[in-house]
Amino acid sequence: MALILGIESSCDETAAAVIDSNGASLEARIVAQRIASQDEAHRPYGGVVPEIAARAHAEVLSPMIAAVLADAGIGLDDLDAIAATAGPGLIGGVMVGLVTGKALAMAADKPLIAVNHLEGHALSPRLAEPSLQYPYLLLLVSGGHCQILEVAGVGQFRRLATTIDDALGEAFDKTAKILGLGYPGGPAVERMAREGNPKAVPLPRPLVGSGEPHFSFAGLKSAVMRAKDAGVHGDADIAASFQQAAIDCVIDRTRIALETASPGMTALVVAGGVAANAALRGALEGLAESHGLSLVAPPPKLCTDNAAMIGWAGAERLALGYVDPLDVAARPRWPLDENAAPVRGAGVKA
């Protein structure tokens, strides 16, 4: 048994959790977890304001950790390690969580594990589904990232596709802003889409059918803006048509990845905040079945940013003997596949 404290503060959720990992079997349970959302603070701005986010993390993180430890019925001395997000993300928020983790690790003389936030998402399906084995094909979809990767093990990622412009979650958020649906945009668009006709508005599917492995959503976002300005269609129809077009793009790229991935993939896995979208899950399930695979997706509460996934990634790393020095640096950019070539149009490693 290993008790891991997970700390997450990379964007606009402050989170802490205690994970109980059952040693070499790597089955785990969430002993306690808490999440504080900053939605109300950022809603007037239509998106996340980094300074507001960092201040909010600093205000609530320490008392939250004390509360989570109390919920778990343990003290700092009972922990086996402390895992904190070290990037990528908004650097102010990342540093709040990482510095807090370092201080606790030093005070309690416990190992520190600096976790890549994206690896937290990538490994979270194994927390929800212990039978999931490496290697698997991962679709990682969130507000800042849209990637397809082969996951061969902890720290072993091969990127097959990424976005050349907007991430999928960013496209959802911008569509919500265009339609006046507020923040956070993803859930708002999904709710409104249920009331609309997904075939009502003829929106483009960028790069679909081209054989291009990478994603592009900027043109779709622009088409949504033109549809709104035209005033011909209602917001529900625009939302439904956007969601269907976005899903069609994702299915097209994921199909390409399934056909070009290394042999032996055990499952198609989806993770990240947008993985909570029910329509996307349904489409991916059908795609996985057509390729003789099962779809593995965490429950919605583990799709959005949380500390349980950080604690779990820490548990997986600790089981392999991976720990970090107390002077480990925060990283605003931290690709899972550090050997991946720069992407055309993006200008950076995504």
Swiss-Prot record:
Q: Which InterPro entries match?
A: ATPase_NBD, Gcp-like_dom, KAE1/TsaD, TsaD
Q: Where does substrate bind?
A: L140, V141, S142, G143, G144, D173, G186, N277
Species name for this entry?
Novosphingobium aromaticivorans (strain ATCC 700278 / DSM 12444 / CCUG 56034 / CIP 105152 / NBRC 16084 / F199)
Q: What is its EC number?
A: 2.3.1.234
Q: Which family does it belong to?
A: Belongs to the KAE1 / TsaD family.
GO CC annotations on file: cytoplasm
Report what the protein is called.
tRNA N6-adenosine threonylcarbamoyltransferase
Localization annotation:
Cytoplasm
Give the primary localization class.
cytoplasm
Specify whether NAD is a keyword of the entry.
no
